[in-house]
Design a protein with these regions (language model features):
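Acyltransferase/transacylase module recognition
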Residues: 233-241
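Iron-sulfur-cluster electron-transfer modules
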Residues: 1-161, 298-315
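Iron-sulfur (Fe-S) cluster-binding modules
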Residues: 1, 12, 28-31, 37-41, ...
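Ribonuclease/tRNase effector modules and their secretory precursors
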Residues: 292-416
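Hydrophobic alpha-helical positions that pack around
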Residues: 189
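Active-site rim beta-loop-alpha module in soluble metabolic enzymes
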Residues: 228-232
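Nucleotide-sugar donor phosphate/pyrophosphate-binding loop at the beta->alpha transition
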Residues: 126-131, 240-246
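Active-site glycine- and acidic-residue-rich loops that bind
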Residues: 84-91, 95, 194-208
Length: 416
């Protein structure tokens, strides 16, 4: 229970903001996590999924550093962050093209992760590695000024990479000619907790909305006293039930559609059924469909696929670099109903792990068969968790009936 308490904190700083004695509960919880990691006492189940997602964002599947196409160097570089690209890749691409067209001196592109997951997890070694990689990519571009779309990235840079000159996208984006919101539109504005002490960012967002003619309903808890969406501090990984309650309660502060300018805030709200838009949905209408406030939260597998596809498309369309297909199990088509898909999402089981299990089982005949249903059961252990998938071959692909994972190791039990 002590572990769960320490790992359930969103590290958002609201406790300190309202405390008459200025007690920083978030610092205490993060220091406790650092101590647990250093002593080998942090349970892998608490943060492993988020840390592996960070690894993915720093891998060749997503990471990229380029000056603006056709230029040897650029005065600025756009860093959209990992979650905007995972949630809304079309909007990320559109805003980058806008920056290239309107910013003097050229705007390069840097894809990757700021290291926030390892920071929140208390994994200092992993954080240092992420920052070394990010710093190396940034320095390879000539140390340009960073235009960041994510307030968490900005906060991370300010506190841990002070040599980086960074500014919010919302402070530099030219809105002229962008957006056609309906007349009289009023939205409830959700400030991300990482913008709590960034008044210049919050003000820039409100000025953009005023320029678009969008009226803002200020939530009872906003600005310096805004609440976390449940994703911060990896709360949703360590204590998903609490995270759902936090974001559900946040969504009940107003009956209006919400507007967020953090991708994870928007997706967290959408995940509990709260109609929510991202600011880029207003600035680049049509990219999220006819009802952007009703856009569902992309699942974990889709988030990775979106990042990889965005990287490939940008390399092809802007730099003329066509990447060869990465060998793997992408050709294995998975078929499942909505209830199974929801179960996999809740259990944080990725499609790529199911494909890997099925590919190995089909190639080696290394699977079990249920005597009554004929369903096959196969496993895959890429890291510390073993993934099991119950499936059956079909004419159009492999039908997934169920999947689960565990962290047990059966001594002498072979690969299964």
């Amino acid at each position: 229970q002590a572990n769960k308490l320490v790992n359930s904190c969103s590290l958002c700083g609201l406790c300190q903001e309202v405390c008459p004695s200025d007690f920083a509960m978030q610092d205490l919880c993060r220091q406790a996590r650092q101590d647990m990691v250093a002593r080998g006492k942090m349970p892998p189940s608490a943060h492993e999924f988020a840390l592996l997602d960070q690894d993915f964002s720093l891998s060749a599947d997503f990471a990229l550093a380029r000056p603006q196409a056709g230029q040897a160097s650029s005065a600025e570089v756009f860093f959209p962050g990992c979650q905007l690209c995972a949630s809304a890749p079309a909007q990320a691409q559109a805003v980058y093209r806008r920056l290239m067209a309107t910013r003097p001196g050229g705007v390069g592109l840097l894809l990757g992760c700021c290291g926030a997951p390892s920071l929140w997890a208390g994994d200092d070694a992993r954080l240092a590695g992420a920052h070394d990689q990010w710093r190396g990519a940034w320095e390879s571009l000539g140390r340009p000024r960073v235009i960041a779309a994510c307030s968490t990235c900005l906060k991370t840079f300010a506190e841990h990479l002070p040599e980086v000159e960074a500014v919010s996208l919302w402070q530099v984006l030219d809105p002229a000619g962008l957006g056609r919101p309906a007349p009289g539109l009023t939205l409830a504005l959700h400030d991300p907790c990482t913008a709590r002490h960034a008044p210049q960012v919050r003000q820039a967002v409100r000025e953009l909305l005023a320029g678009l003619g969008v009226a803002v309903e200020e939530l009872r808890l906003g600005g310096e006293r805004t609440e976390c969406c449940g994703f911060g501090g990896l709360m949703a990984n360590a204590n998903p039930e609490l995270a759902r309650e936090v974001v559900r309660r946040r969504g009940e502060l107003s009956g209006r559609d919400y507007l967020a300018y953090c991708a994870m805030c928007r997706d967290s709200l959408a995940g509990v059924g709260k109609r929510s838009l991202h600011l880029l949905d207003l600035l680049f209408p049509g990219l999220a469909g006819e009802d952007p406030a009703g856009r569902p939260r992309p699942g974990w597998s889709r988030r990775r696929e979106n990042r990889s596809r965005l990287r490939r498309e940008l390399l092809r369309d802007l730099w003329g670099e066509e990447e060869a297909a990465v060998p793997g199990q992408a050709e294995i088509k998975l078929i499942m109903d909505e209830s199974v898909a929801a179960r996999l999402e809740e259990r944080r089981i990725l499609a790529e792990d199911l494909r890997a299990a099925i590919a190995r089982a089909e190639a080696a005949g290394d699977h079990l068969v249920h005597p009554e249903t004929g369903h096959r059961l196969a496993s895959h252990r890429p890291h510390q968790a073993t993934f099991w998938v119950e499936y059956s071959p079909g004419p159009e692909g492999f039908v997934v009936h169920n999947a689960y994972s565990h962290r047990m190791t059966v001594v002498g039990g072979g690969r299964l």
